[in-house]
Amino acid sequence: MRRLSALLLATSFALVAQEHGAPAKSKAPAHAAAPASHAPAPAAEAPDSPSAALAELSAGNARFVAGRRTRTLDTGHDAAMRAALANGQAPFAVVITCSDSRVADALLFDQEAGRLFTIREAGNAPDLQGIASAEYAVEHLGSKLIVLMGHTSCGAVKAIREANGKPLPGNLWALQSGMAGLLETTPQDPNEDGKAYMARLEEANARRQAQNILDRSALLRERVGSEKLWIVPALYNLASGKVQFFKPISPAAEEAHH
């Protein structure tokens, strides 16, 4: 009985203390969110010149190679980004590249949605519609740079090489048409192994396609001539992740091409 009375008395004191504002211990909710490890990357300013646009892509690719992407990792500002892009776009660069699933230009240049205008064709060989798309981005969206980017281990280049002028089946003739002359202008050296020759063909194709869009577009020639636009061939290495940029195509080069 004495023990029961003592227990009841202790319980009564605890209730009285709680009524008079004694703080009660409580556990933090199990679902409480942990503090963010870092804030979302601020929106990047758009480059205001062709050289600045190329520098931005080069810096983004360096982050990708180093495993330090900043603009394609954070998701905290996705909603705001979608809201802003719903009102329009202003991509600072056009990337014409291959349809290969391993070539993800936004990731390898570490750029958010709305910053790159992407045109994809097998063999990075744009047809007239692809060139028109590039003109649209330059004329109406303000793009200041076109990167014509090939890549290593390109299946389209391999197919052209193995066909060696013989017709490919189905509609693949269009692929041969878009890359016509590649083997003739880039013959294999007698002592050159297959791997080295493929690497040379992939680079040559990127350069030829960059020249091709300049040849076929008066609008792009005018912009390049007035230094408002650069057209830059490039090659993406699938293994290293690095993009090698080559010298911009110029009107002088275009005239020499003829």
Where are the predicted features?
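Short beta-strand segments
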Residues: 95-98, 120, 147-151, 232-237
